[in-house]
């Protein structure tokens, strides 16, 4: 009898444990009480009550750990929507925890497949290690292989055997690199990776402009506010905005009290024509600061050294449109400052993107697609009346290969919680790729 129990225990340990989520449990019940109760229906190894992070009180739900899928199914069938625990008002909700069913499917990802490989060839290779329940080669919009596939085995042991035998060791005919075989990501892992990718895009946006030290226009590190009693100083009546040309401008400037009298070289009169071109085209969202003993060098021909030539909240000056790309990003992305003119790529290199996250603008759209090639332009369309995104737009590349690569990798992918639809831009008249598409208002 003891030997039989030991045999069963060893068998269970070899099988993979399964996590279940249970809702509608009384908040006063302890883990030991719940364990005893659920063990009446199936073998349960562990109970973990989900508690409030601050009060540490039960939230009325828990996780159960069963030694096998068979035991987990027994518990689900016996309790889900069928049992009510003492002190509870609703039926128990028992289901597999998030990601468990995917994990239990023994699903493998196979990468570095030759583009011309057939499903029969993949089936022939992997069927040596067990029974394949499902096999799918991923294909793009033109039904061309993406060089990867998903397959499912009947048992975990078969999947492990295939991984150990093929991953990094086997090269298929026509390929110079070995296959990559690993466990397929669960939905939770895919969601985490999407978040990390979105964060990296945001980080690149923040570092794209050399004059913008941070994404939100924060002042440079080491900046010390002017707490010396003098504070910021601006010419009366100007408040940091460019003045229209007036007669005797130099005399007007000389009437203004000049700070830092000890530094006469920095106290020259100014006019709009004397401001450097980089600054002359900007209207500042707030007064450019100046304070006594500024750590910033004075501008030639300007009496007030600028602490930071941009807005504190927005990294763009007011003269730029909300949808335009910042100057520092124009070089790596190849995108001009104007958000009105849509730069068109060659035929077959212009994409239509649908289901763009509502919070995305031109700049974010360009950043999301820049890893596939040189982006000539990116445009998100907005409602003229409300300024709210219509959730579709266009991206133009410098080559057809870059556009096709973007379609293969981004079509059907989730971005910001929305599933993208990416395809070649087409002429609405004849359904053919358009070389001069009309902009949709």
UniProtKB/Swiss-Prot annotation:
Cited Gene3D superfamilies: 3.30.70.330
Induction and repression of expression: By abscisic acid (ABA).
Polar residues compositional bias, start-end: 258-273
A GO term for molecular function: mRNA binding
A biological-process GO annotation: positive regulation of salicylic acid mediated signaling pathway
Span of domain RRM: 18-99, 106-186, 349-427
Entry keyword annotation includes Repeat: yes
Predominant subcellular localization, coarse grouping: cytoplasm
Keyword terms of this UniProt record: Cytoplasm, Flowering, Plant defense, Repeat, Ribonucleoprotein, RNA-binding
Disruption-associated phenotype: No visible phenotype under normal growth conditions, but mutant plants show enhanced susceptibility to the pathogen Pseudomonas syringae pv. tomato DC3000.
Subcellular location: Cytoplasm
Function: RNA-binding protein involved in the regulation of flowering time. Acts as a repressor of the activity of SOC1, a transcriptional activator of flowering time. Binds to the 3'-UTR of SOC1 mRNA in the cytoplasm and participates in SOC1 mRNA decay, mediated by the distal region of the SOC1 3'-UTR. Acts as a positive regulator of salicylic acid (SA)-mediated immunity. May act on SA signaling-related genes at a post-transcriptional level.
Listed name of the protein: RNA-binding protein BRN1
Species this protein is from: Arabidopsis thaliana (Mouse-ear cress)
